[in-house]
Amino acid sequence: MADLLNVLKDKLSGKNVKIVLPEGEDERVLTAATQLQATDYVTPIVLGDETKVQSLAQKLDLDISNIELINPATSELKAELVQSFVERRKGKATEEQAQELLNNVNYFGTMLVYAGKADGLVSGAAHSTGDTVRPALQIIKTKPGVSRTSGIFFMIKGDVQYIFGDCAINPELDSQGLAEIAVESAKSALSFGMDPKVAMLSFSTKGSAKSDDVTKVQEAVKLAQQKAEEEKLEAIIDGEFQFDAAIVPGVAEKKAPGAKLQGDANVFVFPSLEAGNIGYKIAQRLGGYDAVGPVLQGLNSPVNDLSRGCSIEDVYNLSIITAAQALQ
């Protein structure tokens, strides 16, 4: 974990990337904000009621005098953001509805990112995943050519680092969706200094089993390879693989001779949200890997979701990762 963060901090040094932390009334978030403010790579923008945030800072003995603190209900930016929101939603929200929605810290914070007044957002310490992701999907939206966002985890143990996806967002995936996730995961790997070798997982290796689920992954492999070639993406994408064939060279040699990947994958695309979510938790709980995420990919600007059980360190680390995404 330290290795990844050190690489990112080096990239971010002197950049002062603006990251919105909507949950300024949460002590973990406010503490992390003061730690980030002391760096030259992330400048936090904290949202919340001034009186409550200042009272919390006093209670925690935190100096927030240099932190930008915005109350969505009273901010002079609100009128501008309301108009921008109404235009963005194209008839799906009246000005009155927008006024009400932008009292919500996640909607207000997301609008700061959309309006270019911030570079990214980290929320979820006191909100559900839906509360964090919904405004991003409505306002920031997905990149051109990408139909969905997805959630990856960095799985880290010592100097070993993998990416698992999708582990957080999409309960229903077709071949096109899996292909998009494979390509976006490869791009994420590149942006974090990895050489992406993407294995698309199944209970079958190179046609060893037959079912509709296997066919879906096989079709996804072809689509992902085609998309990567069109975009001149420097990545290897291959499959379908059982997990052992994707990660153990000796098994790959027996099960998938001649495959582009020979047990050296570092990015794993699971065939379903069930498999991805279970898989990362097994690696975390039984394998002893640190799970960093979910890191959302596919959006026009970075928005990331914390667990409500997060620590101060989690808020700090995810803010650094979000800032690094903003530089892509």
UniProtKB/Swiss-Prot annotation:
GO terms for biological process: acetyl-CoA biosynthetic process. The keyword Acyltransferase applies. It catalyses: acetyl-CoA + phosphate = acetyl phosphate + CoA. Its main location: cytoplasm. InterPro entries: P_Ac_Bu_trans, P_AcTrfase, P_AcTrfase_dom1, P_AcTrfase_dom2, Phos_Acetyltrans/Butyryltrans, PTA_PTB. It comes from the Bacteria. Pfam families: PTA_PTB (PF01515). It is found in: Cytoplasm. The keyword Amino-acid biosynthesis does not apply. Pathway: Metabolic intermediate biosynthesis; acetyl-CoA biosynthesis; acetyl-CoA from acetate: step 2/2. Keywords: Acyltransferase, Cytoplasm, Transferase. GO terms for molecular function: phosphate acetyltransferase activity. Its EC number is 2.3.1.8. It is an enzyme of class 2 (transferase). One of its GO terms (cellular component) is cytoplasm. Belongs to the phosphate acetyltransferase and butyryltransferase family. PANTHER family: PHOSPHATE ACETYLTRANSFERASE. This is Phosphate acetyltransferase. It comes from Staphylococcus aureus (strain MSSA476). The gene is pta.
